[in-house]
Regions:
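N-terminal short secondary-structure element
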Residues: 1-27, 65
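Conserved amphipathic alpha-helical core elements
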Residues: 22, 40-41, 253
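A short LG(V/I)-centered, amphipathic sequence patch enriched
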Residues: 41-58
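Short helix-loop hinge/linker segments at domain boundaries
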Residues: 53-56, 63, 74-97
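C-terminal effector-binding regulatory domain of bacterial HTH transcription factors
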Residues: 67, 120, 241-250, 260-304
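Central regulatory/effector-binding core of bacterial HTH transcription factors
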Residues: 91-154, 301-304
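Flexible hinge/capping segments at coil-to-helix
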Residues: 152-163, 167-192
């Protein structure tokens, strides 16, 4: 029996909840993975997994064995890297998940420079706005915007981007400018679709906080589409500066109600809460943290 392979398949079976998913990762068949699990259970003399037609769950013994198996795989990976002299030479695949707009607009250049620096590393970038399960989906690093973070991940604050109300000068010439937050209801407000707060907008100015109702007929589920719509004169929007700083600098957009702003948007770097993290992933985390700190539209990471 290939013990290391069996342990790896068992660990991923617990994490993915599916032998078929493990087979796809291992580029083999589901019956092959089933045989590996059966052989491992015979070797140990205990049942590790409870199988049904709809689910796969570890038994109590399987849950305890899972933690030990993780440690064994960690030690094995470290020993192999040391034996091959690769402890200082990153190599292998890094799977990265990021919000679609941030990944498309800002992340590509950062990853390209990392690949140029480390020619033995491969990166798979998954752009998706949903909250992915890092372990189940085999993600090494995830970038998450906002304050909601998964409890089972290690989070590192990479930056904070202020959020300002902005509009194109052409729109403001046509419609005028709101003089106070409550007047936003009289203007075309472009917002992100599916927000929990709906048309409610929370703004602050120093110690003052106002909750205002906005009106708008256009809602978009992609930040770059909001950026384009605002630049085209479609209305007023509340945007993080990483998304629009260049347009503000060029004059394509201007601030509206400049004394007021929204809650700053935090950007975190996440990694699975396992003890072992490959060198390639650690280096990319550090690289991304440095690059994000230099992006236009990010400010002191402690201001949140």
């Amino acid at each position: 029996m290939d013990t290391i392979r069996s342990l790896r398949c068992f660990v991923r079976a617990v994490e993915l909840g599916s032998l078929s998913a493990v087979a796809r990762e291992e580029r083999t068949s589901q019956p092959t993975v089933s045989k590996l699990m059966a052989a491992l259970e015979r070797e140990l003399g205990v049942r590790l997994l409870e199988r049904s037609t709809t689910s796969l769950q570890p038994t109590p013994q399987g849950s305890r064995f899972y933690q030990r198996a993780l440690g064994v795989l960690t030690e094995y990976q470290e020993a192999v890297a040391e034996a091959r002299g690769q402890t200082d030479t990153p190599a292998g695949l890094i799977r990265v998940n990021a919000p679609a707009a941030f990944g498309q607009f800002r992340l590509n250049a950062m990853l390209a420079s990392f690949l140029e620096q480390y020619p033995r590393v491969d990166i798979e970038l998954i752009l998706d706005d949903r909250m992915v399960d890092l372990v189940k989906e085999g993600v090494d690093i995830a970038l998450r915007q906002g304050r909601e973070l998964p409890p089972d991940a290690v989070a590192r604050l990479a930056g904070v981007s202020p959020r300002h109300l902005v509009a194109a000068p052409s729109y403001l010439r046509l419609r005028g400018q709101p003089r106070q937050p409550a007047e936003l209801a009289d203007f075309d407000y472009i917002r992100f679709a599916w927000l929990a707060d709906g048309d409610m907008l929370m703004l602050h100015s120093g110690d003052k906080i106002e909750s205002v109702v906005t009106r708008g007929r256009y809602r978009v589920n992609h930040a770059l589409a909001i950026r384009d719509s605002l630049a085209a004169g479609g209305g007023i929007g509340l945007c993080p500066l990483w998304l629009v700083q260049d347009l503000l600098d060029s004059g394509a957009l201007v601030r509206v109600l400049p004394g007021w702003e929204g809650q700053p948007q935090a950007l975190h770097l996440l990694s699975p809460s396992r003890r072992y993290q490959p060198l390639r992933a650690r280096l990319l985390l550090d690289h991304l943290a440095r690059q994000i700190a230099q992006l236009p539209g990010y400010t002191n990471t402690q201001r949140i």
